[in-house]
Regions:
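PLP-dependent amino-acid enzyme catalytic core
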Residues: 1-136
């Protein structure tokens, strides 16, 4: 997956580089060049959250992360009950308060932590985090 710096479109990086670097030049965010359409969406909808997440990430990242490694990263990031109650027929909502911290960050931050753990070279790394205000 190639991503570009939204402030400098010619700056391209891989997913791995974007995770490790965080921000691009001039504090630009990284964004994918394009999203390829998912095939077999109906089949994906039959899967539970974690296997579905693995399939979607595999589609987005291609071979940038080995499939067994990606599967392990996703399964370890979401090792808690993921609830998606039906709101109306055919419409579900992802409840973001079932993780270890009982906050939405369990979905984004835990996977990001797995990515950082997998991608870094073992040298020193500083990770700065903050609360959103409602949990800290």
């Amino acid at each position: 997956m190639k991503l570009f710096n939204i402030k400098h479109r010619s700056d391209e990086v891989s997913f791995r580089q974007a995770v490790l670097q965080g921000l691009g030049r001039d504090q630009g965010l990284y964004f994918p060049h394009r999203f390829e359409a998912l095939e077999d969406v109906k089949d994906l909808l039959q899967e539970s959250f974690v296997p579905r997440s693995v399939a979607i990430l595999r589609h987005l990242l291609g071979d940038e992360v080995e499939q067994s490694t990606l599967r392990e990263m996703v399964f370890s990031a979401f090792d808690f009950p993921v609830e998606t109650p039906e709101i109306t027929p055919g419409v579900r909502a992802l409840e973001l308060f079932h993780g270890p911290s009982l906050a939405f960050k369990d979905f984004g931050a835990r996977f990001m932590a797995r990515c950082l753990g997998e991608f870094h070279d073992g040298g020193p790394m500083t990770i700065l985090t903050a609360t959103s205000g409602d949990t800290g």
